[in-house]
């Protein structure tokens, strides 16, 4: 991995005469400290290829049916671990999807450890990495307690053998340190997860809703939240299957929206369709009916090859090119490199309008009122006599 600021940092290192290039520049003109000389606007994550043909993903399971079933059993245990700890630790949805993405990447490149306890230790390290990447990290003891509870209830327990809880906690702690280092090194410190759950929230955030989407008609504004929620559910449910190995995050978000749009058109509003160039204006990937129909078909093949779950879409994924054409209206892109509306050089100015400022002010006021209301409920005002008897704190 090479950071874009590495050369600038190297140039600023002390030379033999004890002066840095930054010192020389400052001596030539007015002395000014510019942190951009030492650090870039953003740090670029390493870029690796994490999408593959669906046939290669299925082949990764192998050809020995007995080994395939054992592999699936270990994978199911890890996915169950993510699901249980997501509820136990009240993790964000995008942390759960990030853990599933990292898990399938690791499996595709390196396979899984041979035993279920080792797989749980691996899953714990992946979940910790996802949590550190996507949200505020939790205390280590929280992970250890939740993992031990999972191993006691759902993990393998030999007949007649009673687990020593305290001993298990120390083992889980040691394995967490070991596997976390291993996962980060083997994945090349590539934390550019391309998380579709995070992307869908960013693409349709309040900022873009008030700056970019002002031309959307009222009828679409009214029904779009329903489609957006269905797309969110679709993305979360894809975590249990290796769909993240099939396409990148932006394409998966588009896939989810089109699935939600087709479903909405079939069940509720036959005349529904996305506006002209809806995806071209919002996604830095090429979207065509043929590409999306192919992905639906490949998704269906992966479901059949991997896990039979209640969340599987099954025949609902049998969506044709004609059905997709009815809900999208995209111009053909002649340039093989699609336009990226989220390029840093384009968005760094942070243009805003009055509507966004009013929206932001309203949200801040609502948040402030809610916090004050909750605080007054949790901490009722004390009687004056009781306040007077309290000693001051130093």
Curated annotation (Swiss-Prot):
Gene Ontology CC, one term: nucleus
Record's compositionally biased regions (Polar residues): 9-32
InterPro entries in UniProt: Cyclin-like_sf, Cyclin/Ssn8
Region annotation Disordered: where it falls in the sequence: 1-32, 372-394
SUPFAM superfamilies: Cyclin-like
Any GO BP: regulation of transcription by RNA polymerase II
Disulfide pairings: none
Biased amino acid composition, Basic and acidic residues: 372-381
UniProt keyword annotation of Transcription present: yes
PANTHER family per the UniProt record, alphabetical: CYCLIN (PTHR10026)
Protein's job: Component of the BUR kinase complex involved in transcription regulation. This complex phosphorylates the UBC2/RAD6 ubiquitin-conjugating enzyme (E2), leading to monoubiquitination of histone H2B and the silencing of telomeric-associated genes. Also required for histone H3 methylation. Necessary for the recovery from pheromone-induced growth arrest in the cell cycle G1 phase. The kinase activity of the complex requires the presence of BUR2. Overexpression of BUR2 interferes with mitotic chromosome segregation.
UniProt-recorded name of the protein: Protein BUR2
Organism: Kluyveromyces lactis (strain ATCC 8585 / CBS 2359 / DSM 70799 / NBRC 1267 / NRRL Y-1140 / WM37)
Name of encoding gene: BUR2
């Amino acid at each position: 991995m090479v950071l874009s600021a590495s050369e600038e940092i190297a140039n600023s290192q002390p030379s033999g005469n004890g002066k840095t290039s930054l010192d020389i520049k400052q001596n030539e003109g007015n002395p000014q400290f510019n942190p951009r000389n030492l650090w870039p606007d953003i740090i670029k994550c390493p870029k690796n290829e994490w999408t593959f043909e669906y046939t290669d993903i299925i082949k990764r399971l192998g050809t020995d049916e007995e080994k395939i079933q054992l592999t699936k059993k270990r994978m199911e245990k890890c996915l169950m671990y993510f699901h249980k700890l997501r509820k136990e630790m009240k993790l964000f949805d995008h942390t759960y999807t990030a853990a599933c993405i990292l898990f399938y990447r690791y499996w595709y490149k390196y396979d899984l450890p041979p035993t279920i306890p080792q797989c749980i230790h691996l899953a714990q390290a992946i979940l910790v990495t996802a949590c550190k990447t996507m949200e505020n990290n939790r205390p280590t003891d929280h992970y250890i307690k939740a993992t031990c509870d999972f191993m006691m209830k759902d993990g393998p327990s030999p007949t007649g053998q009673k687990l020593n809880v305290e001993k298990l906690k120390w083992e889980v702690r040691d394995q967490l340190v070991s596997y976390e280092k291993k996962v980060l090194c083997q994945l090349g410190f590539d934390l550019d997860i391309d998380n579709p759950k995070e992307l869908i929230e960013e693409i349709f955030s309040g900022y873009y809703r008030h700056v970019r989407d002002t031309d959307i008609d009222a009828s679409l504004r009214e029904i779009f939240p329903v489609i957006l929620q269905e797309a969110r559910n679709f993305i979360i449910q894809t975590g249990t299957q290796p769909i993240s190995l099939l396409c990148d995050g932006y394409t998966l978000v588009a896939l989810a929206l089109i699935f939600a749009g087709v479903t909405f058109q079939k069940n509720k509003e036959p005349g529904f369709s996305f506006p002209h160039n809806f995806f071209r204006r919002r996604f830095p990937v090429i979207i065509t009916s043929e590409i999306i129909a192919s992905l639906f078909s490949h998704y269906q093949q992966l479901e059949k090859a991997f896990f039979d779950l209640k969340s599987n879409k099954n025949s609902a994924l049998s969506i044709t090119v004609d059905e997709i054409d009815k809900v999208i209206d995209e111009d053909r892109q002649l340039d093989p490199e699609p336009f990226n509306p989220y390029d840093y050089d384009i968005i760094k100015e942070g243009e805003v309008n009055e509507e966004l400022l009013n929206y932001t002010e309203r949200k801040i006021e609502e948040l402030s009122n809610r916090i004050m209301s909750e605080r007054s409920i949790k901490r009722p005002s004390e009687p004056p006599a009781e306040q007077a008897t309290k000693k001051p704190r130093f």
